[in-house]
């Protein structure tokens, strides 16, 4: 979405960026994931000779854009309050079971500005509770809509998530903030987010404001941050936002940039921005497997075949990886994909004089033959969900 206003920017690797300022990369935010996991094998009566092991294991999930169009939040309004509890109910068991769940919130939450759902995105603060209830732990705010309600909106959005017990990355409220590091079952996981641009609104900022609060794809700074993350953490995850919207395959710029991130030290790259899913790639570096998904698509939005004539915009994926740390070395040991589909059902309520809808993110595997929810939807809907499952997996083409 959006246009770009040219100002005092430089071009770096094809992206508009501000002149580089000294980047704060020393601050480490560390917290403990909520789930408990046995981290050490001990001798048992049945196996008295079991040697001790220092292996630590963590499961991490990540998903695509949470995009609250006006009809999405408008449909959740009953005249007095907003209720988003249905949005993620079906994916909650999967997301909440992860040791670390990463979400991508695209837009702002700023009660001092009007609600908006395109081309400016400003959602009600009530969306946070449904995101938290689904089991998400951290939210990526590095995207082209984070300045939609100004620097004030950026700060309010970040602080609102933090106030509700969720961490954020990809922006800074305070210039002294550094790399987010989550300690997950004894494994230190660094998480970084970068955006290709900010819809031209960045032209209204001073250089100081820009450098104090935003992470763009200035590759010199990206390299510096990834290398620093590798020094202070066991495992590095990067969520870049770039690419061509609604294209099912990455641009050469995405390929080059994400490969460079792996070369600099990223272990996993979870891409976003195109609003559709794009393929995956497994890279072997120094004998270890690294993983890229070029785009995770949308998790929740009003984009779909009925609104855009593009069926891929209603399809998403929850990536599910396992990492292990043993003898001081942390590796990626498994990668799974869980395709999703956005259900939109008309409800007995109006929005701006038109229909309103109940939105739910369905976990497509539940509707496959033999799945627990196979017989809970009509035939046409079932075919749409099953096609999403099959075609998403085919496009992702995971080879790990």
Model-derived regions, located:
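Hydrophobic membrane-insertion alpha-helices, especially the h-region
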Residues: 2-14
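Acidic, metal/ion-coordinating pockets
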Residues: 12-32, 36-400
């Amino acid at each position: 979405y959006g246009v770009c206003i040219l100002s005092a920017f430089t071009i770096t690797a094809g992206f508009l960026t501000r002149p580089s300022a000294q980047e704060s990369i020393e601050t480490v935010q560390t917290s403990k994931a909520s789930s408990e996991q046995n981290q050490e094998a001990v001798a048992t009566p049945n196996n008295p000779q079991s040697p001790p092991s220092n292996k630590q294991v963590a499961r991490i999930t990540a998903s695509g854009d949470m995009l609250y169009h006006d009809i999405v939040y408008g449909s959740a309004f009953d005249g007095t309050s907003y209720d988003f509890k249905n949005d993620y109910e079906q994916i909650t068991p999967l997301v909440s079971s992860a040791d670390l769940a990463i979400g991508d919130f695209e837009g702002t939450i700023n009660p001092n500005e009007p609600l908006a759902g395109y081309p400016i995105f400003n959602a009600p603060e009530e969306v946070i509770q449904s995101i938290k209830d689904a089991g998400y732990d951290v939210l990526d705010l590095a995207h082209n809509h984070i300045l939609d309600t100004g620097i004030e909106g950026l700060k309010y959005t970040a602080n609102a998530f933090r106030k509700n017990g969720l961490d954020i990355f990809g922006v800074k409220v305070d210039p002294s903030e550094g790399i987010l590091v989550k300690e997950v079952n004894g494994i230190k996981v660094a998480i970084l987010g970068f955006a290709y641009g900010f819809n031209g609104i960045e032209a209204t900022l001073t250089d100081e404001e820009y450098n104090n609060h935003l992470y763009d794809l200035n590759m010199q700074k990206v390299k510096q941050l990834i290398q620093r993350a590798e020094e202070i953490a066991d495992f590095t995850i990067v969520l870049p936002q770039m690419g061509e919207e609604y294209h099912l395959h990455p641009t050469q710029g995405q390929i080059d940039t994400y490969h460079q991130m792996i070369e600099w030290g990223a272990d996993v790259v979870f891409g976003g921005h195109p609003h559709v899913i794009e393929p995956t790639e497994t890279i072997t570096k120094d004998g270890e497997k690294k993983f890229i998904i070029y785009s995770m698509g949308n998790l929740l939005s009003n984009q779909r075949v009925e609104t855009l004539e593009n069926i891929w915009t209603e399809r998403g994926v929850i990536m599910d990886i396992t990492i292990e740390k043993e003898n001081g070395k942390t590796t990626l040991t498994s990668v799974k994909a869980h395709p999703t589909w956005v259900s939109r059902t008309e409800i007995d309520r109006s929005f701006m004089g038109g229909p309103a809808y109940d939105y739910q993110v369905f976990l497509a595997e539940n509707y496959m033959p033999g799945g627990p929810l196979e017989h809970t939807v009509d035939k046409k809907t079932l075919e749409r969900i099953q096609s999403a499952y099959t075609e998403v997996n085919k496009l992702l083409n995971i080879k790990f």
